[in-house]
């Protein structure tokens, strides 16, 4: 029987006139796609090995290389795309689950792109952020319903109400949970240093805490997931907050999976598992099967941290996200994290990543509204994630009801990621999603930190510009202010769920 060949996804084109046979592309490709033929004195590429990371293209000194998508031409069939056919061929070969990485790449609607912002004109003067102060500082944590002040006989006043622990963000953007193992130590160090420079936070993810990150405790959130890798009382007290991960947007309802190829000696020590074994996180926490169980864990962590740190809970955005979020707040969560269908991952079944969950825009709106209706919105902050691409997405998310956002993919792109979606292989040529020492050294954490900090610094400038144009001088005035938003080309029921009006409709 003739075997049907799986076509290459990418084609590497090489200008033989420009190529000087330096063999840099041969040496640097961790996938072994490029090779040199001494007899012909030419460099060739086995295109089926290319993942489209563009590293060879970037390091070629004469710009002789171009990597492009391979047009897999078949008889035009709307229902059977090349992606479907390639998936069937791979599964027929292996009998296995198709794995992938990064975020959902399906052509679903991006609702952020169908939402526009307001601006001040004539009757409500705009504000120049270069000449007037703009407040974008954000506090994450439980707020009090009211503040009580006490006064002594001499007219001095003091705050009587005890304030719950808060995370102070100088910009309403944090670096999301990415574990040591899924990404390299140099990548984590880049984000940690950037967070300290800007005055925000990074999240360790579920992979435990390498000793190199301990110095960043004032800008670090530690995570407790179902695998409980590296979790101890010392770990819980090592950061500024603790986050319980129930689910994530890229793979709702299933656990985590770090392939054994990525479990090196340092990862083994940090996660407390044998070298080379797959690190599997169960789908559920085996001590959480109800809101009451979640409450027990939240307060166990609060006891272990002496009630000095905010405790958050992270879930994926699913159909009944609003009542779940309300239950989490009533269970004692100081902040909740909602991760949408565009959320990224180091490894996930392709079918789950592409088809499970809901867009983050709807999740923000319905959760914020539900908490307001129940009168508990002040009891927890809302942090959202899953496809935040730029400062406009940040502003729209906050106007829909979020307090702050997490970014992951955008941060990795700042470090050099080219979204080749093969993080799970552990061969990242850019030194990000790999544990190979020969590859990780390609990412300089000092340069990475500078680039990640530059990204947040640029977004902060843009957020201030937009706020000033709206006539708003504090981000508090934008939070949940859906009158500042209008929908373009959205159906009536979509506008109703988002809580916004169509473009052209005045106040």
Curated annotation (Swiss-Prot):
Keywords: 4Fe-4S, Amino-acid biosynthesis, Flavoprotein, FMN, Glutamate biosynthesis, Iron, Iron-sulfur, Metal-binding, NADP, Oxidoreductase, Repeat
Amino acids binding [4Fe-4S] cluster 2: 29, 50, 53, 56
CDD domains on file: GltS_FMN (cd02808)
GO terms assigned for molecular function: 4 iron, 4 sulfur cluster binding; glutamate synthase (NADPH) activity; metal ion binding
UniProt-listed Pfam families: Fer4_10, Glu_synthase
Enzyme Commission designation: 1.4.1.13
Reactions mediated catalytically: 2 L-glutamate + NADP(+) = L-glutamine + 2-oxoglutarate + NADPH + H(+)
Binding positions ([4Fe-4S] cluster 1): 19, 22, 25, 60
Top-level EC class: oxidoreductase
Span of domain 4Fe-4S ferredoxin-type: 10-39, 41-70
Record keyword Oxidoreductase present: yes
Swiss-Prot/TrEMBL cofactor(s): FMN
One GO biological process term: glutamate biosynthetic process
Gene3D superfamilies the record matches: 3.30.70.20, Aldolase class I
InterPro entries named in the record: 4Fe4S_Fe-S-bd, 4Fe4S_Fe_S_CS, Aldolase_TIM, GltB, GltB_archl_type, Glu_synthdom
Family: Belongs to the glutamate synthase family.
Protein name per the record: Archaeal-type glutamate synthase [NADPH]
Protein's organism: Thermotoga neapolitana (strain ATCC 49049 / DSM 4359 / NBRC 107923 / NS-E)
Upper lineage: Bacteria, Thermotogati, Thermotogota, Thermotogae, Thermotogales
Encoding gene, per UniProt annotation: gltB
């Amino acid at each position: 029987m003739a075997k049907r060949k799986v076509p290459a996804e990418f084609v590497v084109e090489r200008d033989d006139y420009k190529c000087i046979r330096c063999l840099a592309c041969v040496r640097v490709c961790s996938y072994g796609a490029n090779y040199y033929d001494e007899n012909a004195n030419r460099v060739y590429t086995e295109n089926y090995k290319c993942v489209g990371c563009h590293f060879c293209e970037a390091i070629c000194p004469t710009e002789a290389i171009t990597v492009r998508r391979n047009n897999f031409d078949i008889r035009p069939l709307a229902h059977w795309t090349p992606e479907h056919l390639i998936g069937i061929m791979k599964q027929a070969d292996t009998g296995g689950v198709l794995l992938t990485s990064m975020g959902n790449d399906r052509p679903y609607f991006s609702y952020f792109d169908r939402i526009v912002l307001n601006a001040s004109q004539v009757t409500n003067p705009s504000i120049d952020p270069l000449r007037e102060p703009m407040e974008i500082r954000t506090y994450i944590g439980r707020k009090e319903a009211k503040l009580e002040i006490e006064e002594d006989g001499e007219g001095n006043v003091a705050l009587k109400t005890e304030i719950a622990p808060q995370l102070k963000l100088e910009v309403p953007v944090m670096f999301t949970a990415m574990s040591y193992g899924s990404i390299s130590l140099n990548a984590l160090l880049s984000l940690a240093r950037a967070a300290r420079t800007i005055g925000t936070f990074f999240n360790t993810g579920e992979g435990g805490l390498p000793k190199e990150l301990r110095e960043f405790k004032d800008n670090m959130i530690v995570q407790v997931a179902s695998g409980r890798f590296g979790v101890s009382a010392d770990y819980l007290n090592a950061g500024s907050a603790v986050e319980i991960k129930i689910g994530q947007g890229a793979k709702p309802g299933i656990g985590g999976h770090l392939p054994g190829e990525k479990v090196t000696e340092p990862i083994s020590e940090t996660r407390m598992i044998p070298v080379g074994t797959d690190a599997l996180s169960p789908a559920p926490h085996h001590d959480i099967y109800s809101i009451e169980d979640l409450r027990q864990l939240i307060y166990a962590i609060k006891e272990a941290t002496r009630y000095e740190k905010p405790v958050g809970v992270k879930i994926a955005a699913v159909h009944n996200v609003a009542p779940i979020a309300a239950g989490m707040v009533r269970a004692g969560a100081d902040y909740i994290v909602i991760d949408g269908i565009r959320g990224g991952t180091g490894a996930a079944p392709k079918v789950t990543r592409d088809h499970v969950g809901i867009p983050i825009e709807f999740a923000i709106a319905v959760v914020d509204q539900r908490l307001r209706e129940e009168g508990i919105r002040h009891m927890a902050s809302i942090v959202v994630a899953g496809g935040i691409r730029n400062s406009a997405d940040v502003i729209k998310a906050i106007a829909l009801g979020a307090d702050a956002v997490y970014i992951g993919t955008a941060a990795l792109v700042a470090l050099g990621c080219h979204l080749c979606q093969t993080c799970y292989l552990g061969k990242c040529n850019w030194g990000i999603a790999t544990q190979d020492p020969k590859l990780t050294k390609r990412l300089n954490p000092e340069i990475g930190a500078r680039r990640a900090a530059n990204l947040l610094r640029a977004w902060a400038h843009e957020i201030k510009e937009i706020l000033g144009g709206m006539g708003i001088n504090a981000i508090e005035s934008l939070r949940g202010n859906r009158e500042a938003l209008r929908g373009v080309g959205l159906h009536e029921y979509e506008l109703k769920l988002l809580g916004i009006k169509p473009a052209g409709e005045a106040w």
